[in-house]
């Protein structure tokens, strides 16, 4: 089983949105060999469900997020692919786990966009814009993982 963790600051806006979108895309493509989760590098929102803005945009697009709660990225976490939402979180991940084993990327490395960081809608309130960024990046990420991990689509 290949493991993927999306990481943002509080694990209530961007990374749970990416987790839910990725899960739906994997389900739609009948890919069962990839397990997806999300984490935060900050402790403020531990145990909380996704932000109401994230819930609203996911509901609008019929993407389930049932049972999701904020979890902390920890030094002993072991994922094959760690997908950070911005450079600040890349830096935080490296500080939390300097000997990280999994491959670390920023989500927008899998996008055709010129932006390099997914802005935090907690501050911008632009949940629709973040949804579009995440949505457009996840298919490319899935294709990369399939090729990189030598998986097959069923």
Swiss-Prot record:
Cross-referenced Pfam families: LMWPc
SMART domains, sorted: LMWPc
EC id: 3.1.3.48
Keyword Hydrolase: yes
Organism domain of life: Bacteria
Keywords: Hydrolase, Protein phosphatase
InterPro entries, sorted: LMW_PTPase, Ptyr_pPase, Ptyr_pPase_sf, Tyr_phospatase_low_mol_wt
EC class (word): hydrolase
Active-site annotation: 8, 14, 120
GO MF annotations in UniProt: protein tyrosine phosphatase activity
Catalytic reaction list: O-phospho-L-tyrosyl-[protein] + H2O = L-tyrosyl-[protein] + phosphate
Job of this protein: Dephosphorylates the phosphotyrosine-containing proteins.
Similarity-based family: Belongs to the low molecular weight phosphotyrosine protein phosphatase family.
Name of the featured protein: Low molecular weight protein-tyrosine-phosphatase PtpA
Provenance organism: Staphylococcus saprophyticus subsp. saprophyticus (strain ATCC 15305 / DSM 20229 / NCIMB 8711 / NCTC 7292 / S-41)
